[in-house]
Amino acid sequence: MVKFSTSITCVLFFSVFGFNVLAGKSYSNNAFAFKFQQDTSKKVKSVDTIGEMVRALMKYNKLKDTIHLNSVKNVPNLSLQQMVKGNLAGVYVQETTGEPGTEQSLIVRGPSGLMFNKRDFATLQPVIYLNGVPLTQDHTFAYDVQQYDYTRIGPGNNLLSQVNIDDIQSISVVKDPVELAKLGPNAANGAIYITTKQAKGGIRSISLNSYFGYVTPPGVYTTNASYEDDFRKTFYNRYANAENRANYPGFLSDKTNSDYFGPSNWNDLYYQTAPAYNANLGISGGTERANFRFFGGLTKDAGNADDTGFNKYNLGVSVNMAPFTWLTVSSIVSTARLDRDRNRSFRDRFAEARYIPDLRVPISPNASNYSAYLSEVDKSADLNRTTALNGNLTIAAKLSRLKLSSAFIFDYSESVRDHFTPSTLMAGSNFVSTYFGYNQRILVNNAASYDFDLNTDNHKLTVQIGQQFQTDTYKYNYTRGYNGPNDFIKIIRVLGNVYNNDGTLNPDYLNAYPDFYVFRFLDKLESNLFSVYANASYKYKNIFDFDAVVRRDGTSNGQPDSRWVTTPAFNATWHLGSQILNSNKTIQALDLSAGWGRTVNIFSDDRFAAGPQFRAEGGWPSEPTVPGYASIVTANRPYTSGYVGYGLPLPYADRTNVTIAAEMLNGRLSLALSAYNRNNKQQVINTPVAQELGYISSYRTGLEINNKGLELLANAALIKAKSGLTWTTGLNLAYNRNEVTALPDGLSELVYQGNKIQVGKSVGSYWLHANAGIYETDSQIPVNPSTGQRATFNGIPFQVGDPKWVDVNNDYRIDESDKIVTGDRLPKLTGGWNNTFSYKGFDLNFNVFFALGQKAINQFDANRYDFVNRESANDISSVREISSWQAYSNAKTYPIYNPFSSVVPYRQDQDLFLEDASYLKLRSVTAGYSFTKLFTKAGIKRAYLYATAMNLFTVTGFSGVDPELVNFNGIYDGANITIPRTFVLGFKLDL
């Protein structure tokens, strides 16, 4: 992180509330000075807004942890996660699939909580402020009615895809404890500011940007049944008995079957070269007292497989007015529509329909058979649409030294999915599902500040008080139905007659037609947050800054005795350069900043506020949505999901941050080193309880997780030749160490959802058996001297061909007590390296990013080798996609165990399949040329042509297709679409 000074913090905060602020820089000490405007008609040429304030600070981006937009604005990134990947220190992005428009993960300075499933990761995400609007995300309560969490019900669109890089003025990550404390509970996991280009006065300005290109398919080595038959022969020749051979899969037995042993040419129907393009227009203009900006854009992106695609439509308007010299009014509204063509995979379709067919025979790799399947898929329907609307209205008044502001802020997103699967793909019974849901957030912010007159220019003091009210609403209606009338009616038909023929009310009105089995689910969650705060900012000359804030938050999601929490924070900055470097010609500035702050993390679920409760839980793990018995809805205690009692205070996070930043060589080199420590305390976790209580588990407080680390930012102008040749480079590095420091009731370890959480280990650790080889002879199998019996695995004696798993406690019984906690799902070191070369009108940019130290379980290989149990299980993990008919050049080889053994030798919970998933990628290369000088007389301010290539190569030791395709939980299943290599040609034109 680079320095977050008190002055920057104040300006960003005041800007959010609409204050008009001027920024200036003292080059002698590298400090900032700000003052409020007094007369909008005389002091400035245009009305300032949030974006104008941040734009004023962009000149000093060496002192902020901000993306250098010049290096990413020519790269066709679709989502915010893709824009910040490798460009912000301490921000780790997981893009687990190349399918455009899907969910992606952002984690700032390490995980604050558990990370074993999609629900966990959703609670780790930072808040995103778009023009001061804290954006909502899809709520996790929808997972309560899902059997699988591959994709959340609904369209599954990435809501952070609504931004357009050509409309963005700045992207900054907030790490200053004081700034985060001011933002309150929304920023418990960190915050990222996005500011779009705002309205400004002056001559009308028009900006036109566009690109066109293609995503390309990967190189594929296809296989047929002969390849799989040869693979299995090794195991059958060594271990199979007569019964095993008699049960050999039929699709591998008949070598004359051309469907499986014939041409494997499915790839041309699955992989694709698809167009990607973008076009947008921005117009701004107006007078000094009233001005506007309009932005509209269309983006089409595509995946390189399975006919996936994504369309985005953007529209934004901002208006500024100054009706009086002491009053300003600013408003900005942005809207976007997101349409996604999702994949046609078996797994996702089966998970949605909760229907698992006979999986013993996979789909044929032959193009004719696969084409016939796709023709049936074309009879399906799948609409995935999200509409987002957000904005704010800010009124600010300046009355001498008193400043008043009031802001109305809103965010609303609406999601729809209509899905239909014909009966030909569902064993004679078609399937329909519909989803409607929305997320709504409304805020009212009021603030007043006063600049005290201390009768001296050496001391400056500003005090601010404020009040905020926030209300959130999340709702969804989800319906799925089976056995519709026919495949032409692709909606859930209901009986529409209010009255019977005899005039009586029809009790079945709006019920589904007979034999149409319909299941309906709905949920709604509302929460309110009320906050008051006080902030004081003090400045002594250009030597010392001090900022402090105290905030009081009350939430409806808290328990009665802990709904209100007080959180303080402070930060101090010493401008050492003004004291010790006045005559130094090498170092022009040296600043030391230190801060501490506390942020409350309110519960996202209202179940904890209710205390002991009843729930509709009549199901079981494989069918969690059964609401009752014999058509009667039942309410029961949460015996399976976990008892909720009292004594659950709100979690909170304590942050400490120390940063030293320097500017050297007349601005050609800037360095910043930050050390941070964050303790997340009083977190609630579901823990086991005694069986005689009737409950499986109970929610308890006491989980504590610590993240500490170092971050380095370096920016340098390595070459600034008189000939016009320049080379600028930027490097960001972030090291993070995660550790569980406490568990409820003083526990040292806890088995949780098939994982073990252990104090002193990372929360992202794996719980695995340690593999030490293979038992090749009977003499190698250990014998218990006290019983004379062979060592066992969960009570099953070891045989020749079984794995050697380490007996940690030396009791000759391999079980869960012998598993070890090892590895980490998240990297230790992340970073990015950006370089730009320019010569006259030409420029060349390339971007490299990397993540080192993370581990992944190769479930894809585990399932491939465990073919006996996978095929006999016939569950969701047994699904074989069409893309499984290919071989990989970097595939690993494993010991030849007995796949028929009852110990399941190729189980995935062993370190045999734990791999180093570190990687380094050349993410983008851009070459461009400015034609501006050729069109100056034509009134063109800028004309720029560029070409960009993305995802060019990866350096990794991981045996899978791509280490980025590892799922959020650290499992690589090989089911995700590859991230495509993309080539585009574009232009930027300013008039």
Predicted regions and their residues:
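Short, small/polar-rich motifs associated with maturation and membrane association
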Residues: 1-302, 306-316, 328-330, 388, ...
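Short aromatic-centered micro-motifs
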Residues: 128, 538, 808, 837
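Conserved small-residue
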Residues: 209-257, 475-492, 700, 721-823
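Extracellular/periplasmic, surface-exposed regions of secreted and cell-surface proteins
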Residues: 318-337, 367-421, 431-768, 905, ...
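Outer-membrane beta-barrel proteins
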Residues: 113, 140-142, 147-148, 155-199, ...
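Extracytoplasmic gating/loop element in the C-terminal half of outer-membrane beta-barrel translocons
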Residues: 851-945, 949
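C-terminal extracellular loops and terminal segments
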Residues: 81, 697-706, 747-766, 817-834, ...
